[in-house]
């Protein structure tokens, strides 16, 4: 099933899923995507802002909160790749976050950590308890440790 979702007359998302369950009479009402989801988020010019893939997802309508679970893969507009097992996207607060292990792959580095918080565009973020692999240029002249200063 492929669905286009609009908000205020603007196309915002394309959702591809095998099953979309809507629990409108539950408290709180929510959507369930228990057989996986692929979602593309569009900007105002209809460019793909981000793509999201997860094994399971829930969308809590009143809170405008997405809960993504299992093999969560996100690619930002800049091309950065985010991988985790659990991610929340709070649309009202325009914030994306997780308290689980996260791996972020950029062109020139890989960052990992436990816990993550980002703006909605995934351009500014903080990683907690982090480590990373990245290139460091070694252009500095090394001081001779055998010489003493006078």
For each predicted feature, which ranges?
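Mature-chain termini and adjacent capping regions
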Residues: 1-150
């Amino acid at each position: 099933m492929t669905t286009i979702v609009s908000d205020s007359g603007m196309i915002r998302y394309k959702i591809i899923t095998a099953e979309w369950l809507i629990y409108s009479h539950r408290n709180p009402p929510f959507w369930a995507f228990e057989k996986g989801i692929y979602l593309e988020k569009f900007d105002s010019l209809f460019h793909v802002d981000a793509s999201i893939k997860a094994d399971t997802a829930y969308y809590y309508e009143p809170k405008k909160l997405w809960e993504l679970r299992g093999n969560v893969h996100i690619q930002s507009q800049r091309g950065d790749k985010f991988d985790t097992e659990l991610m929340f996207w709070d649309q009202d607060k325009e914030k994306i976050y997780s308290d689980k292990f996260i791996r972020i792959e950029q062109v020139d580095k890989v960052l990992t950590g436990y816990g993550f918080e980002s703006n909605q565009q995934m351009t500014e973020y903080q990683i907690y308890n982090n480590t990373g692999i990245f290139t460091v240029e070694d252009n500095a002249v090394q001081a001779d440790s055998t010489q003493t200063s006078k």
